[in-house]
Amino acid sequence: GGCLRGEEVRVGRVGPSGAGKWAVMRLIATITTPTAGTFRWNGTDIVGRPVAMRRTLGYLPQDFGVYPELTAEEFLHYMAALKGVPGGAARPRIDTLLETARLEEARGRRLGGFSGGMIQRVGIACALLNDPDLLVADEPTVGLDPEERARFRALLTDLAEERVVLLSTHIVSDVEATASRLAIMHDGRLAATAAPEALIDRVRDRVWEWVVGHDELGRVRDAYRVTKATRGPGGVRVHAVAKQPPSAEATPAEPTLEDAYLSLLSGPTSPR
């Protein structure tokens, strides 16, 4: 079990594929019902009252489909009608959301010509039509190029100023750039929940860098939790997590969130 307090407005749920993130997101979105236990939002048991949750929820699924023949503005009006947003309120709300999602210049373009990043921003606009208190985004940056991913991260950070944003991803850099608190899942269970800085502190003084020969890299990967390897003319500079210096030439390195994440997933191993 766990609890998200009011000040924790940007929560990243991260874990490898198959960790259980998708199942949890579907429970939160009231798409599926838990077989046991309770799930509360602001004190209300949403298992027994899913409609109450849906009124305050905005959900962006991993596979967000659109009608390619519609323009962005037409599609948002269509979705607003499905969500029961009154006609008089829909137009100004859509105008605001097109600006928020940085789509105002593309409002009259057909969705069939949009890039993947633009489609995801249309998805965010749809999720915000009912002005939700909780925005849930499931793997929203998968398939986006680096520029679109950075733009989408910035959008999520801006949106978290007024609501709780729950981001599920297996891409550590996504949560590193957007989340004020992380919930790490592994094998269907919550392995840790903490601020990114606290997770990084767990591996401080256990991160090392040293240079190995090109033919030694495989052995080093087998022996240590290597999070980065940079090839050069003089060998491979290895960045790894280990309790003790892996080599006489190893020097302490600044830990990263990826170091903390991968170390946590690997569990207590030796010599890692």
Give the positions of each predicted feature.
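Conserved ABC transporter NBD signature motif
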Residues: 37-45, 53
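Helix-to-loop junction immediately C-terminal to a conserved catalytic motif
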Residues: 29
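Conserved ABC ATPase "signature" region
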Residues: 77, 81, 88-106
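Hydrophobic anchor residue at the start of the ABC signature
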Residues: 124
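Catalytic Walker B motif of ABC-type/P-loop ATPase nucleotide-binding domains
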Residues: 135-138, 144
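ABC transporter nucleotide-binding domain
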Residues: 152-239
